[in-house]
Regions:
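Active-site-proximal beta-alpha core segment in soluble small-molecule metabolic enzymes
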Residues: 1-76, 85, 106, 111, ...
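General structural signal for secondary-structure boundaries
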Residues: 14-16, 95, 117
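Solvent-exposed, flexible loop/coil residues
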Residues: 15-19, 46, 50, 87-91, ...
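Short, small-residue-rich loop/turn micro-motifs
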Residues: 42, 81-83, 157-159
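Short glycine/threonine-rich loop-to-helix capping motif typified by GTGT followed
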Residues: 48-55, 86-99, 130-142
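Charged (often Lys/Glu-rich) extended helix/loop segments that serve as interaction or gating elements
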Residues: 102, 111, 116-173
Length: 173
């Protein structure tokens, strides 16, 4: 999994440092903006069941903090995407509808506990709905064989077609 939902991430603004609250307060002062909710993205190829629950453990109290400090109750909470896709036999098959139902129930409990209305709960299916829709097909131009060691195939494609392995060591079948 690629983790993007960390304090030191290049993406977004961290709740933990106060930067997210600063941006919320700034957005609320701008007359041309209508702040309706929060969006976060915790990673890519996420298989762990508790990742999104831990995200709710941060975001729901943050919604309450926004209400308490600004008097504004936001209506939307988007946990982004990132559910893992089963590319290899070792990857877990995820029952996304069941996981979403569990998260929605947990969100309802937590918002009720903090006296918040249930926000519109959003997630983005992303690659989980398109990952099996295509494949990469290359033509082998030549093969270099090194007896007793290995062989290499020169193809008419490369890292620019799919940089994820080089960048993140992502595995595919």
């Amino acid at each position: 999994a690629v983790s993007t939902g960390k304090v030191d991430s290049k993406f977004g603004a961290a709740v933990e440092t106060g930067q997210a609250m600063e941006l919320v307060k700034l957005a609320l002062t701008l007359p041309h903006l209508d702040l309706r909710g929060l969006h976060c993205h915790v990673g890519s190829q996420v298989f762990g069941e508790d990742v999104y629950q831990r995200t709710l453990d941060i975001m729901v109290p943050f919604l309450a903090q926004i209400r308490d400090e600004t008097g504004v109750t936001l209506s939307d909470l988007n946990l982004g995407g990132g559910y893992g896709v089963r590319y290899t036999a070792e990857d877990e098959a995820i029952n996304i509808p069941a996981r979403l139902a569990e998260l929605a129930a947990y969100l309802k409990e937590e918002t009720e506990r903090l006296g918040l209305p249930m926000p519109r709960f959003l997630m983005e299916p992303g690659r989980s709905i398109v990952a099996d829709a295509g494949l990469s097909l290359y033509t082998v131009g030549s093969v270099k064989r090194i007896p007793g060691y290995k062989q290499y195939a020169a193809v008419d494609g490369g890292m620019t077609d799919n940089p994820r392995y080089a960048l993140y060591q992502s595995r595919y079948t």
